[in-house]
UniProtKB/Swiss-Prot annotation:
One cellular component term from this protein's GO annotations in UniProt: plasma membrane
Keyword annotations: Cell membrane, Membrane, Transmembrane, Transmembrane helix
Compartments where located: Cell membrane
Pfam families per UniProt: Cons_hypoth698 (PF03601)
Topology of the protein relative to the lipid bilayer: Multi-pass membrane protein
Protein name: UPF0324 membrane protein BT_1919
Length: 336
């Protein structure tokens, strides 16, 4: 198993190095995104030459290390951040997350697409991109290629928004105040990295509020995973009643750990440098998980998924950009 873990760690080191390149930084591709790309390149070139004894190590990275990474992600948040941003941003976040996930599941049914991919794509679009998809993947036990397909859609449309929002704001197409633009950016962009990139391009006043609003969405991962677990358990119970084989339910204890870490971090007991070091370690662990998932994803599996995941992601993207804009513009004035 050790060989597989070391292989993924090596790829993750490469992802960190590439992520520091000026071009990669300019498009705000996090090491996690670079990692899954490297993993997919490996899957479609040298994967067949991998010794079978290395596979358990790769699976360990995509499951166990993933959960540790999600728990440590809590060191990026405090409950004080949530209180500072106020009721309007929290309400907008709740609406965005609820409509995106529920709407995505419904659209997935209309498109007659794979339920797992529809759920992962919806959660990724609604909450925090790749990290949310990884958390949900661990809960519903989706196949690695489904996770990779969902992550790909999030990366594509999130990257488009990262360049689109600053362009629209600078050229006067967004009739929003700086506070509203911060809420709009944080509530509708997919990845944390996308929010950071877009916020920096529009100024510190927007960037700071956008990041906090985004982090509130990240915190919503916990209730979403718990609700998902409950619904999956109910669905599998019905399958057993119909005579089908029982499938074990994965209780997302790591989500509880994530919230516990947020609570601990809210007391500000650790030095800032130590927290920064933990966050760097956490990014590396999540990069290992993403890379491991990428190594299980071949082009053939993308072909198997078809165009429907991208159609769903596009529809959700239109909702986030257009629906999110009108929510922020017309709802926040009544709440502030």
């Amino acid at each position: 198993m050790l060989h597989g873990v070391l292989l993924i760690a090596l790829f993750s080191c490469a992802a960190f190095y590439i992520g520091e390149m000026s071009f990669v930084r300019s498009i705000s591709f996090s090491p996690m995104i670079v990692g899954i790309i490297l993993g997919m390149l490996y899957a479609n070139s040298l994967r067949n030459h991998l010794p079978e004894t290395w596979v358990p190590g790769i699976q360990f990275c995509s499951k166990k290390i993933l959960r540790i990474g999600i728990i440590l992600y809590g060191f990026r948040l405090t409950f004080q951040d949530v209180m500072a941003i106020g009721l309007p941003a929290m309400l907008i976040d709740v609406i965005i997350v609820a409509v995106t996930i529920c709407g995505g599941i419904y659209l997935g049914k209309l498109l007659k697409m794979d339920r797992g991919i529809a759920l992962l794509t919806s959660i990724g679009s609604g909450i925090c991109g790749a990290a949310a998809i990884l958390g949900a993947e661990s809960t519903i036990k989706a196949k690695p290629y489904k996770t990779a397909v969902s992550v790909s859609t999030v990366v594509i449309f999130g990257t488009i928004s990262m360049f689109l929002y600053p362009f629209l704001y600078r050229n006067g197409f967004c009739a929003l105040t700086p506070d509203q633009m911060g809420i709009y950016t944080g509530a509708t962009l997919h990845e944390v990295a996308h929010v950071v990139g877009a916020g920096d391009a529009m100024g510190n006043g927007i960037s700071d509020s956008a990041i906090i609003v985004k982090m509130i969405r990240v915190m919503m991962l916990v209730p979403v995973l718990l609700i998902t677990t409950y619904l999956v358990a109910r669905a599998r119970k019905r399958q057993v009643q119909k005579g089908q084989k029982f499938q074990k339910i994965a209780v997302p204890w790591f989500a509880i750990g994530f919230m516990g870490v947020i609570a601990f971090n809210s007391f500000d007991l650790l030095p800032a440098q130590l927290v920064a070091g933990i966050n760097t370690l956490d990014t590396f662990l999540l990069t290992m998980a993403m890379t491991a998932l990428g190594t299980e994803t071949s082009i053939d599996k993308f072909r198997k998924a078809g165009a429907k995941p991208f159609v769903l992601a596009l529809l959700l993207y239109v909702w986030l950009v257009v629906g999110g804009y009108f929510l922020v513009k017309y709802l926040t004035p009544y709440l502030m």
